[in-house]
């Protein structure tokens, strides 16, 4: 028989001398031989996420690694936010990098910052205060492209040449920031050194996020219960027989694409084979 209890709060968990656990559930005592903690992380609290699983880990003396939001949009509070807000809804293909890790995927501008697969993936490797790099032309050699435009389209304005690659609105935003003095200057009259500096901005756009959207919109919680304390064969706690941890509550985080769901299902199945 399987009893499913909804809207129930576990207020106390006590291991017994004969094995198993006594649980206080909604004011009633329940005994179980095996206890599987599948509480998830802190992400999206409006769906009921909480630190309950971490509290259980602390109770039984298990190591916890510092948690933070992962697979989450970046936010900005300076002029970058103005650019993002102006171009909110625009998506472009980029390559984003931080700490030696790069993702070549889609970037989406929002009214508060940047999102999309590239930004979400990178957020799991970013630390507060770090600068990120964005290659706005990942399939082009920006320097060679601008110098080639100078030869082939000498009378054209720089923004009109770049717009087909980055969109008219975003190119206008970049122009206002990086080459306002050459807004109406034919590219043939712009010095090669200036074009090379602009190419560096396009291929290595350095931005410093003010933060992220946090757990409110994060798809996962980074870190959690130290896996050194958990058997990779059974998901059972090494120091407390009968206690299992599975899914996101553990220090396991996957990339976008269903990997975190797969981890939850696989670790749950594994524990289910041994309880």
Regions found by a protein language model. Name each.
Residues 1-3:
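N-terminal Rossmann-like dinucleotide/flavin-binding domain of flavoprotein oxidoreductases
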Residues 6-20:
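A conserved short coil-to-beta-strand element within the FAD-binding core of flavoproteins
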Residues 10, 29-49, 57-58, 107-112, ...:
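Short hydrophobic core segments
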Residues 44-45, 73-74, 110, 114-117, ...:
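Glycine-rich phosphate/pyrophosphate-binding beta-alpha loops
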Residues 62-66, 72-193:
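An anion/pyrophosphate-binding glycine-rich loop and adjacent beta-alpha core
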């Amino acid at each position: 028989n399987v009893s499913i209890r909804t809207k129930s709060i576990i207020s106390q968990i006590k291991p017994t001398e004969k094995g198993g656990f006594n649980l206080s559930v909604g004011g009633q005592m329940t005994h179980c031989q095996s206890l599987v903690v599948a509480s998830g992380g802190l992400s999206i609290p409006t769906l009921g996420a909480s630190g309950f699983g971490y509290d259980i880990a602390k109770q039984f003396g298990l190591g916890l690694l510092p948690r933070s939001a992962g697979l989450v949009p970046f936010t900005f509070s300076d002029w970058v936010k103005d650019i993002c807000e102006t171009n909110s809804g625009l998506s472009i293909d980029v390559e984003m990098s931080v700490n030696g890790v790069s993702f070549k995927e889609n970037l989406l501008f929002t009214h508060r910052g940047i999102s999309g697969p590239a930004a979400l993936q990178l957020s799991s490797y970013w630390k507060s205060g770090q600068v990120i790099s964005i290659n706005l032309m990942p399939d082009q050699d920006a320097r060679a492209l601008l110098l080639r435009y100078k030869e082939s389209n000498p009378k054209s304005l720089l923004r009109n040449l770049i717009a087909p690659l980055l969109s008219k609105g975003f190119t206008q935003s970049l122009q206002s920031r990086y080459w306002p003095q050459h807004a109406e200057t034919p590219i043939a009259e712009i010095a090669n050194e200036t074009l090379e500096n602009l190419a560096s901005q396009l291929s290595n756009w350095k931005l410093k996020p003010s933060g992220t959207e946090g757990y409110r919109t994060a798809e996962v919680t980074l870190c959690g219960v130290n896996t050194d304390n958990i058997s990779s064969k059974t998901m059972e706690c090494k120091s407390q027989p009968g206690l299992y941890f599975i899914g996101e509550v553990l220090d396991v985080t996957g990339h976008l694409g269903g990997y975190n769901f797969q981890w939850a299902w696989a670790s749950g199945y594994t524990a289910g084979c041994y309880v």
